[in-house]
Amino acid sequence: MRDPVETYMNLVPMVVEQTNRGERAYDIFSRLLKERIIFLTGPVEDGMSTLVVAQLLFLEAENPKKEISMYINSPGGVVTSGLAIYDTMQFIRPPVSTLCTGQAASMGSLLLAAGEKDMRFSLPNARIMVHQPSGGFQGQATDIMLHAQEILNLKKRLNEIYVKHTGQTYKTIEDALERDKFLTANDAKEFGLVDRVIDKRAEEPAAAKTQ
């Protein structure tokens, strides 16, 4: 028998729109995708990464100039999956706005910082966490050495990406990511991960209330 809580959590709300051809039903995420809103929620892994990349490419094809909004609530996950999303965000022509709701940890924080400059936001009670990549390996000693070198290469590359998007020095980023570093929304703003902390939706983006 399936867990009723799990069943409930897997239910996706449907919304109904009136069109010239009658009623049309969408799941809530598809409806918001029509508004150029992408949800990046849960662990970052290959399946989720593929869906996010596909949505980014679809919205670029729909309109190569209009802004895309990405709402992030993620504990992080697989580095290569996150970098696939990151590279696509940089590759496509539309500017990508990012907004942290809940948390943006590990790869989630990197994707939050990767939004278009001056278009990276956080809600006031969101939490952001940055740290260096981690991994566990087993096998022959030579293979373990190769994996260790690869994770050091990834660490260096991730540090460089944070430097690019935060404006911090490499040494500052390296020191900050040495251990899990937890940040409030305002701390993340001071660190350069986001540009503004917003607590109300404004009628005009430029008029958004900031902290």
UniProtKB/Swiss-Prot annotation:
GO molecular function, one term: serine-type endopeptidase activity
Substrates-to-products reaction catalysed: Hydrolysis of proteins to small peptides in the presence of ATP and magnesium. alpha-casein is the usual test substrate. In the absence of ATP, only oligopeptides shorter than five residues are hydrolyzed (such as succinyl-Leu-Tyr-|-NHMec, and Leu-Tyr-Leu-|-Tyr-Trp, in which cleavage of the -Tyr-|-Leu- and -Tyr-|-Trp bonds also occurs)
Family matches, as InterPro entries: ClpP, ClpP/crotonase-like_dom_sf, ClpP/TepA, ClpP_His_AS
Record's keyword terms, sorted: Cytoplasm, Hydrolase, Protease, Serine protease
Highest taxon above the source species: Bacteria
NCBIfam families assigned: PRK00277.1, PRK12553.1
HAMAP family: ClpP
Protein name: ATP-dependent Clp protease proteolytic subunit 2
Native species: Bradyrhizobium diazoefficiens (strain JCM 10833 / BCRC 13528 / IAM 13628 / NBRC 14792 / USDA 110)
